[in-house]
Design a protein with these regions (language model features):
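Acyl-donor (CoA/ACP) binding surface of acyl/acetyltransferases
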Residues: 1-34, 66-171
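Conserved GNAT-fold acetyl-CoA-binding loop/helix
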Residues: 31-53
Length: 171
C-alpha cells in the first residue's frame, strides 16, 4: 500500500486494482446516485477501468488525483478523497464515504488531512467545493474544513441546472 497520509482513524492511500470491488459496491447507494451520478459504477468492469485510469494519474500534477480512504481498525475501504481540475488553474475537492460509514466524521477527517498536503504538492492555493444545496452533509464537511461559501443559487451541476453552493478554501 502506497500511503499518502494517515490520521487517527484513517489511511489515505493510492488505489490499487484489488480495491475495484469495494469501489463498485460503495458507489451504488442512492445518495451517490443523487449527488454524484457520474461516480456510480454499475458494473465491476466499470470500476476496474476507472481504477486503472486513476492509478495512471499518480505522480502527475494534472489530475484527477483520487485516493482511497481506508479505516485503520479493520482495513475497510470506505470511500475516497480527490482533487479534480475544473479549469485553468482551478481545482475542486471531492469526497465520498460509503453510506454505512457516514455521519462519523470520516469525510471531514480525510479532507483535513488530504487537502493541505495535496495543495502544496500540486502547487495550488485555492480549491473549490461545489455541491447540490440539498446535500447538507457535504456542506457541513466543507464548512468544518475551512471552506467559505461565496455562491448559493441556480447553477450548472453535472448534466443540468440545479440549486448549488460554491465554496472556496485557501492555503
Amino acid at each position: 500500500m502506497n500511503v499518502l497520509v494517515e490520521t487517527e482513524r484513517l489511511i489515505i492511500t493510492e488505489m490499487t486494482m484489488d480495491m475495484a470491488m469495494d469501489i463498485h459496491k460503495n458507489s451504488l447507494d442512492e445518495d451517490t446516485r443523487r449527488f454524484v451520478p457520474d461516480e456510480v459504477f454499475e458494473t465491476l468492469e466499470d470500476a476496474k477501468e476507472t481504477v486503472e485510469f486513476l492509478m495512471s494519474q499518480y505522480g502527475s500534477t494534472d489530475g484527477p488525483l483520487v485516493y482511497a480512504v481506508i479505516l485503520k481498525v479493520d482495513d475497510t475501504n470506505i470511500g475516497y478523497v480527490q482533487l479534480v481540475p475544473i479549469g485553468e488553474g482551478k481545482w475542486e475537492i471531492g469526497y465520498h464515504v460509503a453510506k454505512a460509514y457516514t455521519c462519523k466524521g470520516y469525510a471531514t477527517e480525510a479532507v483535513k488531512a488530504f487537502l493541505p498536503l495535496m495543495a502544496k504538492r500540486v502547487g495550488i492555493e485555492e480549491v473549490y467545493g461545489i455541491r447540490l444545496l440539498e446535500n447538507v452533509s457535504s456542506g457541513r464537511v466543507l464548512e468544518k474544513c475551512g471552506f467559505e461559501t461565496f455562491f448559493e443559487g441556480e447553477g450548472e451541476y453535472h448534466d443540468g441546472v440545479y440549486g448549488i453552493s460554491k465554496s472556496v478554501w485557501k492555503l
